[in-house]
Amino acid sequence: MIKLFICQKKYYLTAIFLLTIQSCASVEYKPLVTGATTAIAPNIWPKVVNGSLFQEKIPINYGYQPLFEDHRPHNIGDTITVVLQENISASNSSISNMSRDGSANFGLKIAPGQLNNILGVNFQDNTTSLDSFGRNNFSGKGSNSANNKFTGLITVTVKRVLPNGNLKVIGEKQVSINKGTEFIRFSGVINPTNINKNNFISSTQIADARIEYLSHGGLDDVQKMGWLQKLLLKISPI
């Protein structure tokens, strides 16, 4: 009974150890777009009958559209279609060369002139010299380039109207194909004057744009590194 308890305890300790190293090896993904990905317009305000043509007591005009009002979105819950046109390329290169040379010469007197023939050796030159020379060369070269392109359409909703009239928008699109799901999330700040008559706006005209593309499915699992490989990669000295 005692042996069985010790064996079970070893199994528990092993399981705890494996879970610990797995959590250390995993990399937490932080999404760019956080919070709710849609916005719902508030309830329609009750109509105020005050005997005038213009209902000035209604602070916002949900539920009706004045004849001469700009039809572009400007209220919470309004929808806008964003044309994704992201094409970013960057490259850099660096070359460095360093060289250093040094030399030294030292002259030493072997013996005084009176002791020149004591050992039966005649030193024609009663001095010797020590020469030292060193050289250090370094050459390095590196280059890096990246090219990213993202095109498509996504319809977003107005989440908040800023004090200056700009619109904070957010949206998400999900597409499921063959047991795999793809997500496109978007958020940013739009100037309503940049929205065209067809209710479209280019992503290049949106400030603080955050575009996120994710996929969940078999292909996504294949692209992930196993926890043991991550752990070995972290502790590997090379």
From Swiss-Prot:
GO CC annotation, single: cell outer membrane
Assigned keywords, A-Z: Bacterial flagellum, Cell outer membrane, Lipoprotein, Membrane, Palmitate, Signal
Domain of life: Bacteria
Keyword Secreted applies: no
UniProt topology in membrane: Lipid-anchor
Any Pfam family the entry gives: FlgH
GO molecular function: cytoskeletal motor activity
Lipid anchor positions (S-diacylglycerol cysteine): C24
Principal cellular location given in the protein's record: membrane
The protein's assembly and partners: The basal body constitutes a major portion of the flagellar organelle and consists of four rings (L,P,S, and M) mounted on a central rod.
Role: Assembles around the rod to form the L-ring and probably protects the motor/basal body from shearing forces during rotation.
Protein name per UniProt: Flagellar L-ring protein
Organism phylogeny: Bacteria, Pseudomonadati, Pseudomonadota, Gammaproteobacteria, Enterobacterales
